[in-house]
Amino acid sequence: MVKEFAYRGIPKEELDNMSLEKLFQLFNARQRRSLTRGITDGKRKLIEEIKAAKAGKLKNPIKTHVRDLIILPYMVDVTVNVFSGKEFRPVTIRTEMIGHYLGEYVITNRKVSHGAPGVGASRSSLYVPLK
């Protein structure tokens, strides 16, 4: 048996039909505050592109630098390429992501693995014979 996703006890079908005001009441205070303060031009453009992609009107993949957009139910099943600071990483929005920020799913830093120090990196390495 497959477990159905429910956001705060409400199934996805009801979330799709719910008005934004009722949906905002389900979110945490941080998400509510972000959504009620208004939508910037960058977020508005991304929302329009997501709606066009859902309708099948968009040919190119969606690329964005907007990481602070809160995922809403109508954005589910869309792939968005989010900028990580170096490259665009694809994020396919799933139902479990509703209410989270888009940037939470693209890590901006990674573990650095340094190689061996080169010649002249320190005073003692000057006397190491070259290979």
From Swiss-Prot:
The organism's place on the tree of life at top rank: Archaea
Disulfide bonds: none
Keyword field contains RNA-binding: yes
Biological processes annotated in GO: ribosomal small subunit assembly; translation
Similarity annotation: Belongs to the universal ribosomal protein uS19 family.
Function: Protein S19 forms a complex with S13 that binds strongly to the 16S ribosomal RNA.
Protein name: Small ribosomal subunit protein uS19
Organism encoding this protein: Nitrosopumilus maritimus (strain SCM1)
Lineage, broadest ranks: Archaea, Nitrososphaerota, Nitrososphaeria, Nitrosopumilales, Nitrosopumilaceae
